[in-house]
């Protein structure tokens, strides 16, 4: 009963804010930014936010966040930041001319005050897996709710894409007018060529496995022998940094074993894009990060240990896996170690294929994506 009452109060409150958003005039020089439900300061929104703060003082840029630790960090950097759904956040949102997000307005900011503002959807990367409407078209129930509660409709003004190939997928996935999709490149990729932050003489690889929603998956189930892997990496002079999804975390016993390794590092990077250039090669299975890593023209090793199961149990892919993954495919840790060694001996082995796929999915590689996105936003305000 309390849950129903709370939902009704939220709806009434939302209706009031939605009506106010019709009345209160928007200020085109106030832009609000958010990312990943307010829990992270990362991704495309972060990089555009910092670009605007640095280069366009005429714009009042504000970050909206749920995480109070992040708020403190940003305040210490002299950024303007408010807690999501706080009175200050709602009041400034009612006046903001641009809502800039990485996931969607409801999650990253607040959907209620967004009427008459320009919604800029930066998204969070080129999709290999099918997304949004391409996965599940809206049900009649969802359509009815959006009709009854019009503020639930996210009317995107600009959706940024990295290439014309990516734009084709976004048209169907978002169900959006193609004219609203702008090929600008992703703001986060402007920092890919930044100076290295992890300094060591040894070679370094970053391993980014994808979370499986429909079934349990553990990368260490596929012929992983701790001592063999440790010795092999030592002999090659290679460190592997593995970022696991929280739900894929190994048990405590296995984590203790991994913590004794000198060459395997389980890490949690808040913003992987700020350090991608530090690594000599990337290991992944289905993570769309590799589309960005292509810009560095470094080796990529694909480790789809459970490829057949993934394709049958998880979301469909937009492409034939082998046609858009320019690099060797490892079926287990034994093959993965062999491919790491091969990539160190012949780093240019797949370079032509890397360039082919890079050019298909990335139109720009000039570190001016933020500038292009900024110009597109200004054009519609």
Task: Please report, for each region that a protein language model flagged, where it lies by residue.
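N-terminal pre-catalytic "stem/leader" segment of glycosyltransferase-like enzymes
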Residues: 1-90
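A nucleotide-sugar donor-handling region in carbohydrate enzymes
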Residues: 3-17, 128-221, 246, 345, ...
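Conserved catalytic-core segment of nucleotide-activated headgroup transferases in glycan assembly
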Residues: 42-50, 54-56, 181-183, 187-256, ...
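Extended catalytic core of nucleotide-activated donor transferases of GT-like folds
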Residues: 46, 78-142
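Donor nucleotide-activated moiety binding/catalytic core segment of transferases
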Residues: 81-98, 246-291, 324
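A donor-sugar binding/catalytic signature common to diverse glycosyltransferases
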Residues: 99-130, 269-314
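Catalytic binding pocket for nucleotide-activated donors in carbohydrate/polymer assembly enzymes
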Residues: 288-361
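C-terminal alpha-helical cap of glycosyltransferases
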Residues: 366-381
């Amino acid at each position: 009963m309390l849950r129903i009452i709370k939902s009704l109060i939220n709806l009434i409150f939302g209706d009031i804010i939605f009506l106010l958003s019709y009345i209160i005039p928007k200020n085109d020089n106030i832009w609000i930014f958010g990312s990943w439900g307010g829990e992270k300061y990362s991704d495309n929104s972060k990089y555009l936010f910092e670009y605007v703060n640095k280069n366009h003082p005429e714009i009042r840029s504000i970050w909206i966040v749920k995480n109070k630790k992040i708020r403190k960090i940003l305040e210490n950097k002299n950024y303007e930041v408010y807690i999501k759904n706080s009175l200050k956040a709602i009041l400034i949102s009612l006046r903001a001319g641009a809502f800039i997000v990485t996931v969607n307005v409801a999650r990253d900011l607040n959907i209620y005050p967004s009427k008459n503002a320009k919604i800029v959807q930066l998204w969070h990367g080129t999709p290999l897996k099918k997304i949004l409407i391409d996965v599940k078209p809206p049900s009649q129930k969802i359509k009815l709710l959006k009709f009854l509660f019009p503020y639930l409709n996210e009317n995107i003004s600009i959706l940024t894409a990295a290439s014309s190939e990516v734009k084709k997928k976004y048209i169907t996935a978002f169900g959006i007018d193609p004219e609203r999709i702008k090929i600008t490149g992703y703001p986060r990729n402007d920092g890919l060529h930044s100076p290295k932050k992890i300094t060591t003489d040894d070679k370094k690889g970053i391993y980014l496995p994808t979370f499986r929603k429909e079934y349990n998956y553990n990368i260490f189930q596929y012929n992983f022998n701790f001592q063999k892997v440790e010795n092999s990496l030592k002999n090659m002079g290679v460190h592997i940094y593995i970022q696991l999804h929280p739900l894929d975390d190994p048990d405590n016993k296995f984590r203790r074993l991994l913590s004794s390794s000198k060459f395997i590092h389980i890490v949690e990077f808040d913003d992987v894009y700020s350090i991608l250039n530090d690594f000599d090669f990337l290991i992944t299975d289905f993570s769309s990060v590799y589309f960005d890593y292509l810009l560095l023209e470094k080796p990529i090793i694909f480790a789809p240990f459970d490829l057949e199961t993934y394709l049958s149990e998880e979301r469909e892919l937009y492409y034939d896996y082998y046609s858009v993954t320019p690099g060797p495919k490892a079926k287990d840790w034994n093959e993965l170690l062999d491919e790491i060694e091969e990539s160190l001996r012949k780093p240019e082995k797949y370079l032509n294929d890397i360039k082919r796929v890079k050019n298909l999915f990335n139109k720009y590689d000039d570190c001016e994506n933020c500038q292009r996105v900024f110009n597109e936003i200004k054009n519609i305000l």
